[in-house]
């Protein structure tokens, strides 16, 4: 996709009504510090539109990033951060559940998994939760640049086995450093939202 414009369009908190912008949406879920903001910045060709942080749990809202007035990339709150109180975890869970239940424009949910580690219990729970809400999660294996090339296939297999993925389920390795996987992700987004894949640096 040629990125002509990318803006943070809507920020939703726990009491916010999910907006109906009329634009197709693709959402990104994953545990805290898995690299969601870095991925979204990479997709938008922006360095810091989606705020990144070394501190897990930074994203506490649902953030809608409007691309070319054509579609929204939706950044969901991260899960699994140990220092978050049970009340906060419940609040974030309700926000995500509310979004999945009420969005009329959601076309796909991407679930991000750190390629260096086996899927956690929280990852498996989120995968099942997305399925339960009627979406087939597309898996993005993040932090590819942190792994030796010789380990990649073994770790991708561990992700497939850990999530008990169906045969043929898409798993895309992604590197925030080299942008490997970016084109493949955009091609999927374009096919899911009805656009034509093209590219601009």
Kindly label every feature range from the protein language model.
Residues 1-83, 194-195, 199-201:
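Conserved G1/Walker A P-loop phosphate-binding module
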Residues 3-15, 146-201:
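Canonical P-loop GTPase G-domain recognition
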Residues 18, 56-63, 77-107, 115-129:
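Switch II of P-loop NTPase G domains
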Residues 22, 48, 61, 88-92, ...:
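Helical mechanochemical/support elements of P-loop NTPase systems and associated helical scaffolds
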Residues 43-47, 100, 163, 189:
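Hydrophobic aliphatic residues
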Residues 58, 71, 78-81, 116-118, ...:
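Conserved nucleotide-binding/hydrolysis micro-motifs of P-loop NTPases
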Residues 65, 142, 185:
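Residue-level signal for inorganic ion chemistry
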Residues 97-169:
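Conserved C-terminal guanine-recognition region of P-loop GTPase G domains, centered on the G4
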